[in-house]
Amino acid sequence: MVFLRFASLGLLILSLSACGLLPEQEDETKDWSANQFYSRASAELADANYQQAIKYYEMLEARFPFGRYAMQAQLDVAYAYYKFDEPESAIAAADRFIKLNPTDPHVDYAYYLKGVVNFTRNIGFFDRFVPVDAAQRDPGAARQSFNDFAELVRRFPNSKYTPDAIQRMVFLRNNLAQSEVIAARYYMKRGALLAAANRAQYVVENYERTPAMKQALELLIEAYDGLGMEQLAQDTRRVLALNEEQGTFKDFETAKPRTLGRKVWDFIGLDRN
């Protein structure tokens, strides 16, 4: 028994000694320049190796916190996080870039990226294979995305990202309106007529000139009839008939406005000057 104990102790000592004899793994990046870090990170990003790209961008900023490479890495890592399906980290990185570089020529991209991240963040893994109507998803991220794009449009009306942001805002607004209609129908089926009327009224007041407007008015009429509010039901019927006569109920995308930009200015109430 004593022999076995000494033998075990000897083996332990030998193993520890062997560990000490093995050379430590050398850090290939120890002598890298900022340019080398950025080039490697960008190559990994281009090859869709997003986790590796994030690692090198963050190492670059840690070792070379000042200079143009570090500044660009702050922005690129936000995109890498977005592609790596880490929306919270992507938005945090974009916010950090905006805070540290408010006058940078590329800061408009940081605002745009925030909108894009929120635009897609509520599409989960399952939705990628079994698509779900966007209007049936939780509208929280859609509202935040709309606000992010609106901030971009307000601050940088001439940005190259603004036209795409405006198109996305139109899509988001239509789907936000439709989500309210879906909620109103849900309440209607459950017999909660007042709740249904409130949801439909919200669409009428906040989402004019969307495809959901006609449905909202029809739901309002049904709810008012059920509640015995005859005068309100009649008034809403007149509004519905008037809009149908004037051809108001056109899909926003197929209507012929003066300009797409002017449509969105009207919707979000921004300064048109």
Where are these regions (language model features)?
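Sec-dependent bacterial lipoprotein signal peptides
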Residues: M1-C19
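Acidic, polar-rich low-complexity tracts and alpha-helical solenoid repeat scaffolds
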Residues: A18-N273
